[in-house]
Amino acid sequence: MEIRHSFDVKKCILCAYFVTFFAYLIIGFVPAGATDYIVSARISIPAINLLSDVTTLEKDGRTLHTPDTIVGSYSESENKTLLIGHSSTVFKNLDEAEVGDAIWYNGHGYQIVETDTLLKSEINMDKLLKPEETDTLVIMTCAGEELDNYDATHRLILTAKAV
């Protein structure tokens, strides 16, 4: 008895398309290039297995709108950058980062020198964005108890200095 197998390239490509599409619908998988963000940099924190694209943000009055699935960057000076992202997506493991962990951002090395968790009402954005003498990253995400509209009671803030 002979068994014949046929291979149809068109069916295979169509199948791969549908698998990707349904993965996107079911688990939120987004194929590369499927967002409206312009990638301006990349960030890596190896200790927590973080690797993400970064897009530059513009202020809307006094508000920064956090991207859904990647990191957003904002800077008012050459040597201090604020990076923000959602704790439910890109920064889901950020609370596991520790003082001393390495960060690679835009081709430069940094080391975490401070971690802090503050009430949302205690955040002073002017202080967070104030220029410093050395290159500094400030990374912020939601923490604490979840509130409505994808918000939370606290903010986890990591400060990293260039090495």
Describe these PLM feature segments.
Residues M1-V19:
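N-terminal Sec-pathway targeting helices
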Residues L14-V163:
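Solvent-exposed, non-transmembrane regions of membrane-associated and secreted proteins
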